[in-house]
């Protein structure tokens, strides 16, 4: 699962008098506690970091310097450190920018850092931690992980769902073809809309066996319902681990100071509006005996039985897990496809090389299929390079320590939230030559037998989560990403719009996606008979 995009600015400002009184109170408390017992300091030091205020820690500094991820990265550069300790409330947040230290956490000490933090947003989106990805370490997490490994991501199940994925890949090509085939010079299309629709619809198809919640569009594109649903899912991802003030000072939650809770609940209501009627109807069909064979993942979850022949999953577990599965694929594929095309338009020789690979491996008489994906090393390298240079979020999902530990010579207290910096790992000049240059060849040069694996096991950057909390669907996720990019590159010739002479590479300051959607000139490059009707 992908990390939320960023850590957002609050839109709610507390009264000035209350803020002033609070600041004065903090000064007094800090003065009184300045002479605390030095013997309480552990022999092994904490990682370097700012001096925290009593009770609130460094929350005031974070609040003043939003977005939080840029403040954290700036602070680490100021401290000249690859690991820091920032206390927010009573929680120690441990950001890491070095692959060596990252490996100490998630490889050498993986068992200790196998939990997740409790946040307002993740508790809401998981219906009280009934799911896998965001749930804290424990029996419920183990139960749901067993279900997904055995029933959703095993090779036979992934193959069983191939036809549904093919339908969505064909629909993507149909949608773009309908937009650009009428004119011999093609047409300008919004790449983000197409890629985002595919990213949402492919899991929707596998879970609910439907592309649309409503009627959709005649050209194959998303309708109002699909756009609303995807937007709500992206909102949930955005706020899942967004440094919400009340996650560190729970007694402030009633005030919703940064406005996160209102947005999360609104987004969750939208998701439920579209999904729950389908789930409820399907549950009733199984109970009434109208269904007895699975047709999609929703059916699979409903049909599972425990040792006593009773339903293995409750209705609420099914609803929560189907939501989390959609969250896992809705952001990363479209982010990779959009940034890859942006970079390749800036270096047209890369477009040519990708097209040549597709023509050599697939040809022009058929559309690229999942069976071709392992034989497309250059396109896989392009996707991997986007993961390095343009990550979907600034940090990975937080790992929480379930016991005190010593890592890289520092004391890491129980309950610490460890976050690996996707930005700084992927752009680290000590690891990557010309780190800000988009260069897919760097991954081909180190690949064994030209097999480019999108998973980065050495944590030189973060692609998929790893270790005990690692992504269960790495293979499927990699295939979805490469298929999206390959279908875009094989089906259409891409160029800058007629009135544009320069690519805009501006990165959103709050999110990490491209600040503005990619608009590009698309023109069919295959015989008309190949395109789905």
Swiss-Prot record:
Glycans are attached at residue 209. The chain crosses the membrane at residues 12-32. It is an enzyme of class 1 (oxidoreductase). Confined to buds. It is a single-pass membrane protein. Its EC number is 1.14.14.156. InterPro entries: Cyt_P450, Cyt_P450_CS, Cyt_P450_E_grp-I, Cyt_P450_sf. Its cofactor is heme. It is found in: Membrane. It catalyses: L-tryptophan + 2 reduced [NADPH--hemoprotein reductase] + 2 O2 = (E)-(indol-3-yl)acetaldehyde oxime + 2 oxidized [NADPH--hemoprotein reductase] + CO2 + 3 H2O + 2 H(+). GO terms for molecular function: heme binding; iron ion binding; tryptophan N-monooxygenase activity. Heme binds at residue 471. SUPFAM superfamilies: Cytochrome P450 (SSF48264). Keywords: Glycoprotein, Heme, Iron, Membrane, Metal-binding, Monooxygenase, Oxidoreductase, Transmembrane, Transmembrane helix. It comes from the Eukaryota. Pfam families: p450. PANTHER family: CYTOCHROME P450 77A4 (PTHR47944:SF19), CYTOCHROME P450 98A9 (PTHR47944). Belongs to the cytochrome P450 family. This is Tryptophan N-monooxygenase CYP79A68. The gene is CYP79A68.
